[in-house]
């Protein structure tokens, strides 16, 4: 990306535990972080501080931010925010939304409408699907919707990759 000082910056957004940088502006670890409103933030209700899981309504927010415009049921209070509607598409679903707001080590704004927006201006909606069927046992299927919320067009220089590690054994 071209920074405000005219120099090129190379933003690689990583999310593994080790060797993550600290944001100079927010003084937080630079990684995708959960967006508020998509899980129950009250630890007295969501004791495990879990992301929203379809089979545990204690993890759900009071209402879903992305469903506020439903004129018949604004926010879908008390309902699961499923991929195909108010019910899970699998035996169990998880759902979380995150963004790259804390990637602020570069003199760069991805959105000219918002001078406080940092990172590449990306929002990621992630949904995990699990089934009890033996053919799909021990597997989580992940679906990612990645949205550029900023005003910067990245043309052909963005790559998406996922590294998964269950951390078994340490």
Task: State each model region's role.
Residues 1-170:
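A long-range scaffold signal marking pre-active-site subdomains of enzyme folds
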């Amino acid at each position: 990306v071209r920074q405000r000082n005219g120099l090129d910056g190379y933003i690689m957004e990583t999310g593994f535990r080790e060797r993550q940088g600290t944001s100079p502006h927010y003084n937080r670890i630079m990684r995708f972080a959960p967006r508020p409103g998509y899980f129950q933030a009250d630890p007295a209700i969501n004791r495990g501080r879990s992301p929203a899981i379809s089979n545990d309504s204690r993890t759900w927010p009071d209402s879903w931010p992305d469903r506020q415009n439903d004129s018949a049921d604004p926010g879908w209070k008390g309902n699961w925010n499923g991929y195909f509607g108010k019910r899970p598409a699998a035996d169990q679903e998880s759902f979380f939304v995150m963004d790259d707001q804390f990637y602020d080590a570069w003199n760069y704004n991805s959105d000219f409408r918002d001078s406080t927006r940092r990172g590449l201006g990306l929002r990621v909606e992630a949904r995990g699907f699990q089934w009890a069927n033996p053919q799909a046992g021990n597997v989580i299927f992940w679906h990612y919707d990645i949205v550029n919320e900023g005003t910067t067009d990245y043309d052909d220089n963005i790559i998406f990759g996922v590294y998964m590690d269950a951390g078994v054994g340490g």
